Amino acid sequence: MGAYASLSAVDLGVMTVKELLRRANIDPQSEVIDEVVFGQVLQAGVGQNPARQVALGAGLPVSTPCTTVNKVCGSSLKAAMMAANSVRAGEYKAIIAGGMESMTNAPQLLLGQRKGTKMGDSTLVDSMIHDGLWDVYNDVHMGTTGETIAKECGIDRETMDAFAARSQHRAAEAWENGWFDWETFAVDVPQRRGDPVRIEKDEGVRPGTTAESLGNLRPVFDKDGSVTAGNASTLNDGASAVLIAEASFATSQGWEIIATIEDYCTSGVEPERVMSAPIPAVNTLLSRNGLDVLDVDVYEHNEAFASASCAVAQEIGIPEDRFNLHGGAVSLGHPLGASGTRCLITMLGAMRRTNAASGIVTLCLGGGNAVAMYVRRPE
C-alpha cells in the first residue's frame, strides 16, 4: 500500500517501457522492437496477456508479438533469458524484456464459487500470498524456507541482522551519491485531488537502520526463529525492463552496449530448500565458463531473506565487497515479477561504477528453482 497503490501492474509496466524507448531514442511505431517478453506473477484480474497490454500501452505497433512469463521471483530474468535465446537463434534482433508487479492490487479470491456453496461460510483467499508467497508442496509461507536455510547453513540472527543493516546502508549510499540515477526515473502519481505526487526514490530505504535496532524485532514465521520483518524483503509495487539486442544491430542503431550476456541457467532443489537453489545455479555458470568464484567481479543475489543471501555468499565463497554492492530486496523491495531484471540492472550499475568487467546475478523462486545469468561489460 505504498505510493503506487493507485497504479496497476500494467500502468507501471507501460511507464517503464515508455522510458526505455525514450532513453534508447526509439520511435515506438518504428517497428524496431521485434517482441516484448514481460514477467508478472500475480495475474489474477489483470486481464489477458499483460505483456501485450504493456506493449500496446507503450505505443508499440499492433504487429508486435508479446509473451507474459510467470516463473515466480525469476519471471523477468527468465524473460531476459528467453529474449537472449531468440536473438542468439537469429529469430529477432531487438527485444524488450522485463517484468512488473502490483502486490498492492492483488485481489482476494473466492475459490470454488463457480459451483456454488450449498451451506456454510465461504472464505476469501489472498492471491498475493496464495499465488506468490506460498510453498504449495509443503503448505508453508516462503518465510519458513528462510528459516530452513538459516538452520541448514548455520546462519545466526546476528549475522542476518548485520547483513540487513548493510543492505540498508548500501542502498542509502547509492541513492545519496546518485548511483541509482541511471537506472531509475521519477513517476508522477495522479491524486484524487490536487496535483500529481512525484515519486523519485524507493520508499523502503532506511538509512538509520542498525543491527542493534533490528535485533529488537520479533521473529515472524517461527517464534523461536530468526526471520523478522527487518531482515526479510518487503512487499512492493514496481516494474523494470531491459533492451536485449544483437550486437551489430545495436551498434547500427546507436545504442550503448552496456553488457553482453555470456551464459544463463536454471537450477532445481527440493522445494523446502528453495533458498539454496542459487548455489548450484551460480556454480553451474562458474564451472561451465571455466571460472573461479574470484574471477567474477560483482555478484547480485535477490535478498528475499537475509538468511538466504548470507547462505549463498557463504556457501559459494563470495567476498562481502563483491556482493550486492548497492543493497538489495531487503532495502529496495521485491515486486515479484519485476525483481529479476531489477537485480540485473542494479548489478550493471554497480559494475559501471566500479569499472568491473564481469558479474553474475541470481534469484531463487518458489518451488525450488533458481535462475542465474553471467554478463560481461565491453572492453
Regions found by a protein language model. Give the residues of each.
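Condensing-enzyme catalytic core mediating Claisen C-C bond formation in acyl metabolism
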Residues: 1-7, 124, 151, 210-276, ...
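Conserved beta-ketoacyl condensing-enzyme motif
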Residues: 5-74, 78-95, 100-118, 127, ...
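N-terminal extracellular/periplasmic Venus flytrap/periplasmic-binding protein-like
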Residues: 5-15, 23-26, 159-252, 315, ...
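Conserved catalytic cysteine-centered active-site region
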Residues: 7-8, 40-95, 137-141, 208-234, ...
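Active-site-proximal alpha-helical scaffold in enzymes
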Residues: 69-101, 144, 150-179, 241-248, ...
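Glycine-/small-residue-rich "gating" segment that lines the acyl/pantetheine channel
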Residues: 106-143, 206-228, 233, 379
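Active-site pocket-lining segment
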Residues: 145-147, 183-185, 191, 262-331
